[in-house]
């Protein structure tokens, strides 16, 4: 689950991190009043969406007057912001962040992720702030400095000092950086984060550090024990189909093709998408129904796939390991009857009771196309999607 910038900054402030004075506003009038409470001559106004590239898309502006801030809010609230990280429809803007402008002398980067190779939280810091860290990692990896956190003792001040020295910080800036580092380390563990970024972490003209932007991603598997963060969830920023799938514990990601895919197992799902693409098709989605592919979940999966009007055919690819293929076949039959599937459905079953499953499908009387192999399934579903 992602948080908005204003929500990330609220958490930063709770842990003693320096953030600009700012207010999240729902209406143009609120934005106008917020601008009046901010003492700096210039105000920064930012559209709040779960996507990067807001500035280049016109979603971040600097204004001298309260009227300018209000006009920005009137322009964007209730509209969609399209950036290089969104699809063609963009993301809806329901809040505007109005905050004080800062005199920036230098921009740094500070972030943390769960590193699977070391099985630890790893902090990354760089002097190349304000740009995509992925680009820095690819072109100049020597400019990224790391600190791995021992889970038994947590973040240590000496690690913060080492990073500060490598960033070229001096005097009181080192103390400020260590405080930020320690606060982020505590917050990362306490709130079950998967990723956090401050980009940029700026040095102001006065020589102080300030968290100018914030990005936080929470481990969705830990949401059951994070009631406070659950309340921060903004469903409007998610694809409606993906949100519905999550309620049924289905792993669904919308794509832009015309071949719907329903598979059990993430690895098999990715392989299925690859082979569909190899045979000239374009997957419309990634959908992993998991090990418990019951009739109800299969029916919901069909509903989700078919809610995409671009889908011209559906490929169901099931490996019967934990589940029996005959049970899956019965679930598919029930789901097809319940949902009223109007596009060709290709089914490939392998594993436990696969032969029995294929027999159940053949005797169902439904227009279901059976496939004997993954290649056969891909060829048949691509042909069906093309109307052949």
UniProtKB/Swiss-Prot annotation:
HAMAP family named in the record: Succ_CoA_beta
Give every ATP-grasp domain span: 9-244
Per the similarity annotation, which family is this?
A: Belongs to the succinate/malate CoA ligase beta subunit family.
Gene3D superfamilies under this entry?
Answer: ATP-grasp fold, A domain (3.30.1490.20), ATP-grasp fold, B domain (3.30.470.20), Succinyl-CoA synthetase domains (3.40.50.261)
Query: Where is Mg(2+) annotated to bind?
Result: 199, 213
Cofactor(s) this protein cannot do without: Mg(2+)
Keyword ATP-binding found: yes
Which EC class does it fall in? Answer: ligase
Please give the Pfam families that the UniProt record associates with this protein.
ATP-grasp_2, Ligase_CoA
Q: Provide the binding site for ATP.
A: 46, 53-55, 99, 102, 107
Instruction: Specify whether tRNA processing is a keyword of the entry.
Output: no
Task: Write the record's keywords in alphabetical order, separated by commas.
Answer: ATP-binding, Ligase, Magnesium, Metal-binding, Nucleotide-binding, Tricarboxylic acid cycle
Give the cofactor note text. Answer: Binds 1 Mg(2+) ion per subunit.
Swiss-Prot/TrEMBL catalytic activity: succinate + ATP + CoA = succinyl-CoA + ADP + phosphate; GTP + succinate + CoA = succinyl-CoA + GDP + phosphate
Q: What is this protein called?
A: Succinate--CoA ligase [ADP-forming] subunit beta
Disulfide linkages recorded for this protein, renumbered to the chain, are none
InterPro entries membership: ATP-grasp, ATP-grasp_succ-CoA_synth-type, ATP_grasp_subdomain_1, Succ-CoA_synthase_bsu_CS, SUCC_ACL_C, Succ_CoA_ligase-like_bsu, Succinyl-CoA_synth-like
Which pathway is this protein assigned to?
Carbohydrate metabolism; tricarboxylic acid cycle; succinate from succinyl-CoA (ligase route): step 1/1
Q: How does it assemble?
A: Heterotetramer of two alpha and two beta subunits.
Cellular component terms per the entry's GO annotation: cytosol; succinate-CoA ligase complex
Instruction: Tell me, in a sentence or two, what this protein's role is.
Output: Succinyl-CoA synthetase functions in the citric acid cycle (TCA), coupling the hydrolysis of succinyl-CoA to the synthesis of either ATP or GTP and thus represents the only step of substrate-level phosphorylation in the TCA. The beta subunit provides nucleotide specificity of the enzyme and binds the substrate succinate, while the binding sites for coenzyme A and phosphate are found in the alpha subunit.
Q: Name one GO biological process term.
A: tricarboxylic acid cycle
Q: Which GO terms describe its molecular function?
A: ATP binding; magnesium ion binding; succinate-CoA ligase (ADP-forming) activity; succinate-CoA ligase (GDP-forming) activity
Gene encoding the protein? sucC
């Amino acid at each position: 689950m992602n948080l908005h910038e204003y929500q990330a900054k609220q958490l930063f402030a709770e842990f003693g991190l320096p953030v600009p004075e700012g207010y999240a506003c729902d209406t143009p009038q609120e934005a106008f009043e917020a601008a009046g409470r901010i003492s700096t001559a210039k105000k920064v106004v930012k559209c709040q969406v779960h996507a990067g590239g807001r500035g280049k898309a016109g979603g971040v502006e600097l204004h001298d007057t309260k009227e300018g801030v209000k006009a920005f809010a009137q322009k964007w609230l209730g509209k969609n912001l399209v950036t290089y990280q969104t699809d063609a429809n963009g993301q809806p803007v329901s809040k505007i962040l109005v905050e004080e402008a800062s005199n920036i002398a230098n921009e740094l980067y500070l972030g943390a992720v769960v590193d699977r190779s070391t099985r630890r939280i790893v902090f990354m810091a760089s002097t190349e702030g304000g740009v995509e860290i992925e680009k820095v990692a690819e072109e100049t990896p020597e400019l990224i400095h790391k600190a791995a956190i021992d889970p038994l003792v947590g973040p240590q001040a000496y690690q913060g000092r080492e990073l500060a020295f490598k960033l070229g910080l001096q005097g009181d800036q080192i103390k400020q950086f260590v405080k930020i580092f320690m606060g982020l380390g505590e917050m990362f563990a306490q709130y079950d984060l998967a990723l956090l970024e401050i980009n940029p972490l700026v040095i102001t003209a006065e020589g102080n550090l300030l968290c100018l932007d914030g990005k936080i991603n929470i481990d969705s598997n830990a949401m059951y024990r994070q009631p406070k963060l659950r309340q921060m969830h903004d469903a409007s920023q998610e694809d409606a189909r993906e949100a519905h799938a999550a309620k049924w514990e289905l792993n669904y990601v919308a794509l832009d093709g015309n071949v719907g895919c329903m598979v059990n197992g993430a690895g098999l799902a990715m392989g299925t998408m690859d082979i569909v693409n190899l045979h000239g098709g374009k997957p419309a989605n990634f959908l992993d129904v998991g090990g418990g592919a019951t009739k109800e979940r299969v029916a919901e999966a069909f509903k989700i796939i078919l809610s995409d009007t671009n889908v011209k055919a559906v490929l169901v690819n099931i490996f019967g390991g934990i589940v029996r293929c005959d049970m899956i076949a019965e679930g598919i039959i029930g789901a097809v009857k319940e949902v009223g599937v109007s596009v060709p459905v290709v089914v490939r079953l392998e594993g436990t009771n696969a032969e029995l499953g294929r027999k159940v499908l053949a005797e169902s009387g439904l227009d279901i196309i059976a496939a004997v192999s993954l290649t056969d399934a891909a060829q048949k579903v691509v042909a069906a999607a093309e109307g052949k």
